Swiss-Prot record:
Cofactor notes: Binds 1 zinc ion per subunit.
Molecular-function GO terms, alphabetical: ATP binding; metal ion binding; threonine-tRNA ligase activity; tRNA binding
Chief location category: cytoplasm
Oligomer and partners: Homodimer.
Record-linked NCBIfam families: thrS
Binding site for Zn(2+): C332, H383, H509
Annotated PANTHER family: THREONINE--TRNA LIGASE, CHLOROPLASTIC_MITOCHONDRIAL 2, THREONINE-TRNA LIGASE
Protein name: Threonine--tRNA ligase
Residue segments, region Catalytic: 240-532
EC number assigned by the record: 6.1.1.3
Cofactor: Zn(2+)
Length: 633
């Protein structure tokens, strides 16, 4: 007998032999079911349960169900490509955020017309409602099969699997693909999808390997969700920070400094406003600021462990044959050196050490994307050196600070990913128990929702990742807090405890923005360049209608500059309609228009960005309203 526990109802049923999901689920449940979990592991509904198990049904409404449908769509696309272009070889086709892709080796370049034809063929395959059939093959059987049909990339993948180990393939109609699974019951479950674009990709990500063509697609639960996603993409395209930055003259990136930002005047003003804002928050929350070298000897990176784990992403400089230096990819080992420069007491802890640290990482050129992925960046980095019993209170304080910053920057929807202990880790389980408990309690006390990422913590400690949602519903992982038991020990950091003995501090790595570059990119897209007045690079533009108003405009400008207002004065001879259009394109939030009448009456005509309405105010009142809009508090 096999005992099956249905987790949703907490019911137990017994069966005389092996059963599948189709055997044990009711017809109304099967209608919505995509797959099921058997003792926590995802299975196809057709896969046999061979022993006592607890099951959980996965529906399309679940994230796991949607991911399976996207995986189905990748296989359907591969089948469609093979039917239309038989000489194409298939490689890999995983799911990604919002969709899927498949890499193909082919002598042709896929065109827009090809994508249309592939999509049409996919719809035919969906309509055919082929069953997804899981088969277990031996390694030799799989190599022989894929060799016979000329799929050398599949053979390459299988060859890396240990001899004697079985593998699984999935069959849909006449098409067979190597795959771990699971899949939904049939191709007909894929209701709403669209192919998006073609890009180049190297086999196994190796630039020395063959160049493949990658077709990206998206798949959703229904057509309404698909259409909503496509509309969101259109809006995201309008908000592309690279396009807006060009209109606003914020920054540029060029081939001679790939992945590094040339900040223009307006962009650097924005950068400095954000930095000053964060600096003030840090000071008010008990942090002190430091500055550490950019170029650091290989020896320190070896001690910290980064040389072994991170060397491929480091820019290395040979000072001599025997001495190597590396441009720092992160700040943490340098901060430990400052901690170590004095003998510390338990009474000194916690120590909150912050740095706007300039770092460089050798990211592949294909991964670079405007401000969102760069090689040279500045982190709003800080490290908290504390005792183990202080981890909880410091995490609560950090969560409160992060929520305050995100809210004031316009992000009120925040979630947390909690990553607990991986299989390979340092430290004993009791220490991990206490650290994980401290983080979870802090997140709950801060009123933040969280989801668990089992086993995703670093080998040296658990971590929190803070995800914010922007104006068009996209999620961005920005803030982090990571507990580190290992680095202080490796680098000889200690404090004298109440018992008079040396103890290693716990180190909390934390950031709110992540990097200034990426966060500014997110801000640009969130606001579509229309920043709140306090954050805008230029807060006010004073536009003259006639030369007779030049002196009045200049005098106002000087008064406002003395009060810290970022103001520009346009005294050009252009028509006022042109000036309004120009500064509106530059996303200046407030325009003051002055002509002969305003000079005489000591007034200004106020026009806000996005409005065609102009309102006249006395100069005194206009200044009062302006300063009020600038003041965050």
């Amino acid at each position: 007998m096999i005992r099956i526990t249905f987790s949703a109802e907490q019911k137990v049923k017994e069966y005389s032999g092996k059963v599948t999901g189709f055997d044990i689920l009711q017809p109304d449940v099967l209608k919505e079911a995509i797959a099921f979990k058997v003792n926590g592991e995802l299975h196809d509904l057709s896969r046999e349960i061979e022993a006592d198990a607890e099951i959980e049904v996965i529906q399309l409404s679940d994230e796991a169900g949607l991911d399976i449908i996207r995986h189905d769509a990748a296989h359907i696309m591969a089948q469609a490509v093979k039917e239309l272009f038989p000489n194409t070889q298939i490689t890999i086709g995983p799911t990604i955020q919002d969709g899927f892709y498949y890499d193909f080796a082919t002598g042709r370049t896929f065109t827009t017309d090809d994508l249309t034809a592939i999509e049409k063929k996919m719809k035919e395959i969906v309509k055919s409602n082929h069953r997804f059939v899981r088969e277990v093959w031996t390694r030799k059987q799989a190599i022989d099969f894929f060799s016979d049909i000329g799929e050398k990339y599949k053979v390459d993948i299988i060859s890396s699997i240990p001899e004697g180990e079985n593998l699984t393939v999935y069959r849909q109609g006449d098409f067979i693909d190597l795959c771990r699974g699971p899949h939904s019951p049939s191709t007909g479950r894929v209701k709403a999808f669209k192919l998006m674009k073609v890009a180049g990709a190297y086999w196994r990500g190796d630039a020395k390997g063959p160049m493949l063509q990658r077709i990206y697609g998206t798949a959703w639960r229904n057509k309404d969700e698909l259409n909503a996603y496509l509309e969101c993409l259109k809006e995201a395209e309008k908000r592309d920070h690279r396009k807006i930055a060009k209109d606003m003259d914020l920054f540029h990136i060029q081939e001679e400094a790939v992945g590094q930002v040339f900040w223009h005047e307006q962009g650097y003003i924005l950068y400095n406003v954000l930095e000053s804002y964060i600096r003030k928050k840090l000071i008010n929350n008990g942090y002190f600021e430091v500055k550490t070298p950019i170029l650091v000897s290989k020896e320190l990176w070896e001690k910290s462990g980064h040389w072994d784990k991170f060397r491929e992403n480091m820019f290395i400089v040979d000072e001599s044959e025997s001495k190597k230096l590396a441009i720092k990819p992160m700040n943490c080992p340098c901060h430990v050196q400052i901690f170590n420069s004095h003998t510390r007491s338990y009474r000194d802890l916690p120590i909150r050490m912050a740095e706007f640290g300039t770092c460089h990482r050798n990211e592949s050129s294909g991964s670079l994307h405007g401000l969102m992925r760069v090689r040279g960046f500045t982190q709003d980095d800080a490290h908290i050196f504390c005792m183990e019993e202080q981890v909880n209170s410091e995490t609560i304080k950090f969560c409160d600070l992060l929520k305050e910053v995100y809210s004031e920057l316009g992000f009120n929807e925040i979630s947390v990913k909690f990553s607990d202990r991986p299989d390979v880790r340092a430290g004993d389980d009791e220490v991990w128990d206490r650290a994980e408990k401290a983080l979870l309690e802090a997140v709950k006390e801060a009123g933040l929702s969280y989801e668990l990422s089992p086993g995703e913590g670093a080998f040296y400690g658990p971590k929190l990742e803070f995800v914010l949602k922007d104006a068009i519903g996209r999620s961005w992982q920005c803030g982090t807090l990571q507990v580190d038991f290992i680095l202080p020990e490796r680098l000889g950091a200690f404090y004298i405890g109440a018992d008079g003995h040396k103890h290693h501090p716990v180190m909390l790595h934390r950031a709110i923005l992540g990097t200034f570059e990426r966060f500014i990119g997110i801000l640009i897209e969130n606001y579509a360049g229309k920043f709140p007045v306090w954050l805008a690079p230029t807060q006010l533009a004073i536009l003259t209608i006639t030369n007779e108003a030049d002196g009045y405009a200049t005098k106002i400008s000087n008064v406002l500059k003395e009060q810290g207002v970022r103001v520009k004065t346009d005294l050009t001879n252009e028509k006022i309609s042109y000036k309004i259009r120009l500064h509106s394109l530059n996303k200046v939030p407030i325009l003051w228009i002055v002509g002969k009448n305003e000079v005489t009456s000591k007034t200004v005509s106020v026009r806000n960005l996005g409005s065609e309405r102009q309102e006249s105010f006395s100069l005194e009142k206009a200044i009062e309203l302006l300063l009020k809009s600038i003041n965050l508090n």
